[in-house]
Amino acid sequence: MRRLKFIIYTLFLLVAVAVFLPLCSHGTPSTPQEGTRVVRVLTYNTHRMGMFRKPNDNQVINYLRNGQDADIICLQEVEVYKDSKYLTLSDLKRALSTKYPYSYFDFSVYNNRRQFGNVVFSRFPLIHKQTIRYPSRANISSRCDVVIPSDGAARVVAKKAQGDAGSGLQSSDSEEIRRFDTIRLITNHLESNRFGEDDFEELKQKYSVAHEARVEQAKCVREAIDNSPYPLIVVGDFNDLPLSSTYWHIRRLDMRDAFLCTSWGRYGATLIKGIFAARIDYILCSRALRPLRCTIDRVPYSDHYPLHAVIAY
């Protein structure tokens, strides 16, 4: 009997470690040394962006405008309306364009009433923008290259990127691009489980269908990672846990998880729903880059928390 209790207790501990260790970080934050070049990245599932509130009364917008110091903001589940009674695309641009002159709006739903999808705001030029589309319309991955100016050439590239309404710099500008640090950015919103008040069997079925869709989407993201000529930062709402095949299809062994690398011993829940808490939002980067710090801002403006990382390049 004692032996059986010992085995059960040991198995319980192993399962607990397997479940909670990937949710808790193992590394410690570090302060960049003098001369280290860093980029500050924020990812945030905004849960429809407080779309019924205009900018001055919109908590999400006020947080982005005043509550953090990111160089690049990656937003998922952004919803804007054509009706000026609600939050419009023009409202969003005006509210953040002074702080972030470069942007990428990539909407998976686009009709005569509303737009819904991913948005990137940046202090640096964004070029080579491309959408990775999936069969489910509400989910999308958005790829672009962030061109971080070096001393002496910033004005040239900034002017070219601002003036191009399409993909940004052209192939003829490759000599200019080499004078900059270019990082490929992929921001993601992968398949949701769509859990509601269903019974257990229906929840299992929903999870199974959503998980299969996420794995296929993760393979598409992984293909984009493998084909990148630049170091990458991959962010967003994967809608799956760190133990999942979705996460590992994307991360594999050649990407660093900023939270795991820098936030020793902290529980990394980014989604809170009642008593349920899970880490499903991520900032990953290539091994050529180095996460120095990663924090979760526990602000109550969405059902997700924003995730903020400082990355050396």
Q: Residue locations for each model-derived region?
A:
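N-terminal, active-site-proximal structural segment of metallo-dependent hydrolase catalytic domains
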Residues: R2-A95, Y110-Q115, K159-K160, D164, ...
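Metal-dependent phosphoester-hydrolase catalytic domains
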Residues: K5-T31, T131, D145, E223-I233, ...
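Active-site beta-strand/loop signature of hydrolases that rely on acidic residues for catalysis
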Residues: V39-T46, Y63-L87, F121, S172-D173, ...
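Short, solvent-exposed loop/turn elements at domain surfaces
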Residues: R48-K54, F195, R266-G268, R293
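Soluble or luminal CAZymes and related metallo-dependent hydrolases
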Residues: F52-Q59, S84, T88, Y134-N139, ...
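Structured beta-strand-rich core segments of catalytic domains in phosphoester-bond hydrolases
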Residues: R53, I72, Q76-S192, T295-R298
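Sec-exported extracytoplasmic/periplasmic mature domains
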Residues: R65, D69, S97, L126, ...
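A solvent-exposed, charged loop/short amphipathic helix patch at secondary-structure junctions
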Residues: F195-E212
